[in-house]
């Protein structure tokens, strides 16, 4: 019985092999041909034979004829010429070739557009910090005066004056707190000096931890808009006793104006070099 079962697979295998040999071979299915939607010539772009649009266009010599391969237009050349003339004119009217010194024994430290004045007296350190950015007040609108006879129009232009906000920080030896007074030049007081009036005012007063560059908003800040005038006068006298008075404020305007003009000329020179660079 077992011998008959073993013979069955062999017999079936022989029969299937015979049927395969007798049946005709069918052709294999081939995929239908489809025309290419994009010509192969466009797949490989040649810079010499095909004109590339926009940013793909090969970079050639600049339009002004200097021979450089960078973006350099006739407008850039005119811009550089204008900046050259502007720098010459600004240097002609530059009042201070070097920064003026402050009276009263103040030591000056300059870091870019930020300046710091430091003074030590009787166990106290007074630090005044200001920044010249956005320190020139805008010109007030109004009817322009016509130049008088024999006077050129450019002579009528007002002199630009830098009146920055400044912060006075007073620290005492051995104290962990600093008294900070935020001061500014009121616009209506600029150019209207009086022997009895202050040319600067205190906006805010607060205590801050010494040695910290970032002051905390969680510390109480006193706004002087609603301050008792008696307390305000004592604060102004407190500053005057430490050398921050009208004379100091006048000299600070001179220093800030000189620094602002110096940085403006440096900016024009950097701008000229940037536009001119290849």
From Swiss-Prot:
Q: Where is the transit peptide?
A: 1-70
Specify where the region named Disordered lies, as residue ranges.
136-164
GO molecular function (one): mitochondrial ribosome binding
Residue numbers carrying Phosphotyrosine: 185
- Keyword Transcription recorded: yes
Name the InterPro entries on file. MAM33, MAM33_sf
- Principal localization reads mitochondrion
Q: Which residues carry this modification: N6-acetyllysine?
A: 88, 91
| Interaction with MAVS, as annotated region | 166-209
Q: Where, per UniProt, does this protein localize?
A: Mitochondrion matrix; Nucleus; Cell membrane; Secreted
Which GO BP terms sit in this record? apoptotic process; complement activation, classical pathway; cytosolic ribosome assembly; DNA damage response; innate immune response; mitochondrial RNA catabolic process; mRNA processing; negative regulation of defense response to virus
Residue positions where Phosphoserine is found in the record:
84, 197, 201
Q: Does the keyword Cell inner membrane apply?
A: no
Residues recorded with modification Phosphothreonine: 210
Matching entries from SUPFAM superfamilies are given as: Mitochondrial glycoprotein MAM33-like
Q: Could you tell me the keywords of this UniProt record?
A: Acetylation, Adaptive immunity, Apoptosis, Cell membrane, Complement pathway, Cytoplasm, DNA damage, Immunity, Innate immunity, Membrane, Mitochondrion, mRNA processing, mRNA splicing, Nucleus, Phosphoprotein, Ribosome biogenesis, Secreted, Transcription, Transcription regulation, Transit peptide
What membrane topology term does the record carry?
Answer: Peripheral membrane protein
Subunit structure, interactors included: Homotrimer; three monomers form a donut-shaped structure with an unusually asymmetric charge distribution on the surface. Interacts with CDK13, HRK, VTN, NFYB, ADRA1B, FOXC1, DDX21, DDX50, NCL, SRSF1 and SRSF9. Interacts with CD93; the association may represent a cell surface C1q receptor. Interacts with KRT1; the association represents a cell surface kininogen receptor. Interacts with CD209; the interaction is indicative for a C1q:C1QBP:CD209 signaling complex. Interacts with FBL and RRP1; the respective interactions with C1QBP are competitive. Probably associates with the mitoribosome.
So what family is this one in?
Belongs to the MAM33 family.
According to its UniProt entry, what is the function of this protein? Answer: Multifunctional and multicompartmental protein involved in inflammation and infection processes, ribosome biogenesis, protein synthesis in mitochondria, regulation of apoptosis, transcriptional regulation and pre-mRNA splicing. At the cell surface is thought to act as an endothelial receptor for plasma proteins of the complement and kallikrein-kinin cascades. Putative receptor for C1q; specifically binds to the globular 'heads' of C1q thus inhibiting C1; may perform the receptor function through a complex with C1qR/CD93.
Q: Write down what this protein is called.
A: Complement component 1 Q subcomponent-binding protein, mitochondrial
Annotated source species: Bos taurus (Bovine)
| Gene behind this protein | C1QBP
């Amino acid at each position: 019985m077992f011998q008959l079962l073993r013979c069955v697979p062999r017999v079936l295998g022989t029969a299937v092999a015979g049927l395969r040999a007798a049946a005709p071979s069918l052709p294999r299915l081939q995929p239908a041909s489809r025309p290419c939607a994009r010509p192969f010539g466009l797949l490989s772009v040649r810079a010499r034979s095909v004109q590339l649009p926009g940013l793909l266009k090969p970079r050639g010599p600049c339009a002004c004829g200097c021979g450089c391969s960078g973006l350099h237009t006739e407008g850039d050349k005119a811009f550089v010429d204008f900046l050259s003339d502007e720098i010459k004119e600004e240097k002609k009217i530059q009042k201070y070739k070097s920064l003026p010194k402050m009276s009263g024994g103040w030591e000056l430290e300059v870091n870019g557009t930020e300046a710091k004045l430091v003074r030590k007296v009787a166990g106290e350190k007074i630090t005044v910090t200001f920044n010249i950015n956005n320190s020139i007040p805008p010109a007030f609108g109004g009817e322009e005066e016509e130049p008088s006879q024999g006077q050129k129009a450019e002579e009528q232009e007002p002199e630009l004056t830098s009146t920055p906000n400044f912060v006075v920080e007073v620290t005492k030896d051995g104290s962990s707190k600093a008294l900070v007074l935020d001061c500014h030049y009121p616009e209506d007081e600029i150019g209207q000096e009086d022997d009895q009036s202050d040319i600067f005012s205190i906006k805010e007063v607060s205590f801050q931890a010494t040695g910290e560059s970032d002051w905390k908003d969680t510390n109480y800040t006193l706004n002087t808009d609603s301050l008792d005038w008696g307390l305000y006068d004592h604060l102004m006298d407190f500053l005057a006793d430490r050398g921050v008075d009208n004379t100091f404020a006048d000299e600070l305007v001179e220093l800030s104006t000189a620094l602002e003009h110096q940085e403006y000329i440096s900016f024009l020179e950097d701008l000229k070099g940037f536009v001119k660079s290849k």
